[in-house]
Structure formats: C-alpha cells, structure tokens
From Swiss-Prot:
Gene Ontology CC terms: cytoplasm
UniProt gene name: HSPRO1
Biological process, per Gene Ontology: defense response; L-tryptophan catabolic process to kynurenine
Top-level lineage group: Eukaryota
The protein's name: Nematode resistance protein-like HSPRO1
Primary localization class, coarse: cytoplasm
Keyword terms of this UniProt record: Cytoplasm, Plant defense
Subcellular location: Cytoplasm
InterPro entries to which the protein is assigned, alphabetical: Hs1pro-1_C, HSPRO1/HSPRO2, HSPRO1_N, Trp/Indoleamine_2_3_dOase-like
C-alpha cells in the first residue's frame, strides 16, 4: 500500500518540486585534467615517484588479496614516522613545533584507523586471513621504535603505540611495531610487507644537497605520504568496481566508505602546509621553481595519480544502473530515479542503500578536497598569485579547481529521487 501511495504522489498534480539549476561553467570537456607533461615529470622526479611506485607495486604474497591496498598504506604510515622525526630534530627556533606534533599525531591516528579498517575487512574472508603473512616477531626496521625512545618525540611515539593497540583490537593480527599486544595475537610481518629499509633509502629528494632549506624536506616528505595514499585509493577504486560487477554490494560499500575517509585524509595531509614558515616556504618555492606554466594550471593537477583518483571517483556514477539493476532510459526518462525511490522506501536491500550513500559521500569529500585546496594555496602563496591563474573575464568562466567543486551532482537520479521523496513526506 505504501508503494502504491508513493507512486500516486509521484504523479500527483499537487506535487510541486523546485530543483535548482546547476551553475553554468565554461565549456570544457572535463575540469579534471593533468598539467603539462613537463610539469608532471618534474613533480614525479622531485618526489622520486618512479622508485616509490616500484615499492608500492612489489607484491610478494600472491594469495593475500589485501596486499595491493595495505602495502602502500603501511608505507605511507612509515613515511609519516620519518616526518615526525624530521620535525622533532628541526633546529629552527621559530617553527610551531607543538602544533606540528599535534597535527602529525592526528594524521598518524587517521592513517592507523584506515589501516585497521583494511585489516578488519579481511575477517570476512577466512582464506584471506590465513594468507596474511604473520609471525611472532616485531619489526626491527620501522622508525616508530626510534620515535618512542627519542627524548623529543617519546610522548607521541608512546601514544601511537597505544593507538595501534586500540585500533587493531578487532583484527586477527596486529602490526608488530612494539604495541603491547595484550591479546597475544600474531604479528604482521611488517618489514617484509612495508620494506622500511628500501623506503627510507628514498628519504632525500634530488635537491637535498644544494637547497639548504628545511621546508624542502617537509614538502618532499608530506607529498610522498600524499602520493602513497593516492595509490591506495586507485587500487581501492578498482576493487570497488570489481565488487559491484560481482554483485558484492556490502563489500563494495565498505570500500566506498574507506575511499571517502582517504579523500578526507588527503585534506589533512595538505593542511600540513599551513604550518610551514611562510618565508622559508616561499623561498623553497622559488628554489624549486614551482610556478604555474599556463592559466588554470592548479598545482595539484601535476599529480597524475590524483587526477586519476578524481576521475575514477566521479566515474563510480556509471555503476548506479548495475546497483539498481535497471538500464538507463535512452529517452531520458526517470527510470533510474524511480528505481532509487523504490529502493529507498522498501529497505529490503539495505546494502545497496549503503553503497549508494557511500558513493555520494565520496563525491562530497572529493569536492571538499578541491575547495579546501584552492583556499590553502591562497593562504600559502597569497591571493594575488593564486588568483592570477584564474580566468575571471565573466561570471561564467572559472579556474579548473572551481569547476571541479561547482560541477552539477554526479548522481542526478539519486538527487532527484531524494528530492521527490522529501516532497512526498512533506505533503503528509
């Protein structure tokens, strides 16, 4: 009866729904595109991304399905440990060391939570847990032990160990970084998975020898963390697509919410820039010759990985028909919208609702990232230079970042379904 009443309301002439018009943007094929090949190559060489990529993709445990996602996540965490030691050993008296440590503590906690969620996802697959490489020994190569014993970083190190113990309590193994392990669980073979020694051989960037500026190392290390998580996300997106195609909607939903958390994590990593000393940062920007090569060239689009992650996040919308199990109406009819309304109202396939909600959460998190990035760049280099890259001849022309976060909704059918459902309930 509820369905019939809902359908009557859908076609009722008394139902008036106002849907706002999308903001008009300049006519471009896509607002998300990489910078020039020269700028992207310079960015990759500065961060030593080809060498990092070899470490991210070196898979030694073929029966362990979590390795492509968990390995680069653990490597991002290990690079964060290196950044903590870099801040703790910084001799400049004028840096905001206390806030740096607070932010890095928060960033580390966020990463550990995501790592724990990835490990916890394995509990649904007994065969995968048995394939995880575990042992009875701790890591001997991770920098966390040094953080936990160094006088200037001991407190944050001990807190990180407690966080690992707390967050891994739902998993069948723990990380083996020196955490108490009160449950006596097996330890992940951290050194074999993460490869800390090989990872830290990349601690110096190509300009470290002739640029005497501490912010150079801060910039380099924070972007290595960023790129590691971007690599995690791309692998996660492939897994999401595969799980949707296989009809594993609950597992895909879990991955989609992980992706949302990683978009938020990227914002947290980028926000570290605001703690850099303004003059030292602008000096290293000049030393590294970081500048826009053409109008609308946002600095973040030099990361090909970020561009791929953003495009793949957007293209999740192509999976909506598969989730709703209907084909797109070639005439533009509301077939998807009606299927979504029925799904929301009946609630019998709640795992699909979770997945669709997660997809929209990813859209929101991605657009928030680019909006926040635009404001961060203005705060770091000044509005004059930041705005110089925008085309503002008229109100219908925006820079590439603005176009990203002002795009129309990625999921118009879901958006319309919720609009009509809201109007239906407001009429009762």
């Amino acid at each position: 009866m509820a369905d019939l009443d809902l359908q009557r309301k859908m076609v009722s002439p008394k139902l008036h729904v106002t849907i706002p018009e999308p903001c008009k943007l300049s006519s471009v094929s896509s607002p998300i595109s990489s910078s020039s090949s020269a700028a992207c190559s310079a960015y990759e060489l500065y961060l030593r991304l080809p060498e990092l990529r070899n470490l991210w993709s070196s898979l030694y445990f073929p029966h362990w399905i979590s390795e492509p996602v968990l390995k680069p996540a653990l490597q991002a965490l290990e690079i964060t440990f290196r950044l903590i030691l870099t801040v703790a050993s910084d001799t400049r008296p004028y840096i905001n060391r206390r806030e740096w440590i607070r932010r890095l503590d928060s960033l580390t906690t966020s990463q550990i939570k995501i790592v724990a969620a990835i490990c916890g996802d394995e509990d649904n697959y007994e065969e995968n847990v048995s394939a995880a490489p575990v042992s009875n020994g701790w890591s001997s190569l991770s920098l966390l032990s040094e953080i936990a014993t160094c006088r200037t970083s001991e407190s944050v190190g001990q807190k990180i160990l407690s966080t690992i113990e707390n967050e891994m309590r739902w998993c069948k193994y723990t990380l083996g970084l020196g955490e108490p392990n009160l449950a006596g669980k097996p330890y992940l073979q951290y050194d074999a998975v993460c490869l800390p020694e090989e990872l830290h051989s990349l601690k110096n960037n190509p300009y470290a020898d002739h640029i005497e500026n501490q912010e150079n190392q801060m910039l380099y290390t924070s972007h290595q963390i960023l790129e590691s998580w971007i690599y995690v996300s791309v692998n996660l997106l492939y897994r999401i697509e595969s799980r949707i195609e296989e009809g594993k909607f609950e597992k895909a939903s879990s991955d989609v919410y992980l992706l949302e958390r990683i978009w938020k994590l990227l914002s947290e990593i980028e926000d570290l820039h605001i703690l850099m000393d303004p003059e030292d940062f602008l000096k290293v920007k000049k030393q590294l010759q970081i500048k826009s090569t053409f109008p609308n060239d946002a600095f973040c689009f030099r990361s090909k990985g970020l561009v791929e992650m953003a495009k793949m996040s957007k293209e999740l919308r192509q999976k909506v028909p598969a989730v709703l199990e209907v084909e797109v109406d070639p005439t533009g009819g509301p077939r998807l919208q009606e299927a979504a309304m029925k799904l929301y109202s009946r609630k019998t396939e709640y795992e699909k609702i979770h997945l669709l909600q997660g997809m929209q959460a990813v859209e929101s998190a991605a657009k928030r990232f680019f909006f926040g990035y635009q404001k961060l760049v203005a705060a770091m280099i000044g509005n004059a230079e930041a705005n110089a890259n925008r085309t503002v001849a008229n109100h219908e022309s925006y820079d590439s970042l603005t176009q990203v976060f002002m795009e129309p909704p990625y999921y118009p059918s879901l958006d319309a379904a919720k609009t009509f459902l809201g109007e239906f309930w407001s009429q009762l």
